Amino acid sequence: MKENQKIIGMHYLKGWIRQMSESNVLTSIVEGVLEDLEKRRIPISKLNEQLKSAPDLRGAYKSLSKPGMRLIAEIKRSSPSKGALAEIDDAKSLASKYQEGGADVISVLTEERRFKGSISDLIDVRNSIELPVLRKDFIVTEYQVLESRVLGADLILLIVAALTDSQLKDFYQLSTELGMDVLVEVHDLDEAEKALNIGSKIIGVNSRNLKTLEVSEKTFELILPQLPESVLKVAESGISTGEQVAKVQDLGAKAVLIGESLVKSGNPVHTINQLLNR
């Protein structure tokens, strides 16, 4: 593991931005993530020391592999596309309701600027429930992978569009070595091929283009049927009805990640039952 993470992070940022042909939302988000990371960074030696006392893992893959459609329920205050979604003063209370409703994994946004999430949300939620927890963020450095394990993330998100091929491979390998499951997110067939090439067990198909924020359900139709049965397929973004859940299930999805319709619901337990037709 590398000591000079700050230099690595900034080198990554400059190199990654040079790859982009035009300004987009994802570039802006990654810039902010790296800036915020510098404010909380501790020496990598101390982070490695904290790994020794990291919480026991809960097995997100196992939880999502149960028969029937599974749910990753997300705690999300805001988004770049919709702005403010819900006032969530107590993330752990909402997580408890998700657990009561039958969610299988709780997704916690930790990105601060666009999604109004926080690391403290992740810690609070994991300490208040028994379900596995997904750290939903823009992971673009090795430091964040290590940090995620220290914080207690059972599942970590790696977005193919935000990483070089070597970073995707290295971060995936490190995550699995640390015992975490990995949700590898793709937006097109080329990204899906990259996810398969590194041996991804869980692949999330996001119908939202992170560069333009546009949503197209055709993304599900294009990618989900092309993924092998051995992969645990997750449908992400733009899903708010039971009919949509049933449709992506027919396309091969074994789980859905839903946030907006749940955080805006006055009764998330009831909403979960409606979405999953229970």
Where in the sequence are the language-model features?
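Conserved N-terminal beta1-alpha1 strand-loop-helix module at the mouth
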Residues: 7-133, 140, 174, 180-199, ...
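Catalytic-face loop-and-helix region of soluble metabolic enzyme cores
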Residues: 202-251, 256-258
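C-terminal helical cap(s) of enzyme catalytic domains, especially alpha/beta-barrels
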Residues: 222-226, 264-278
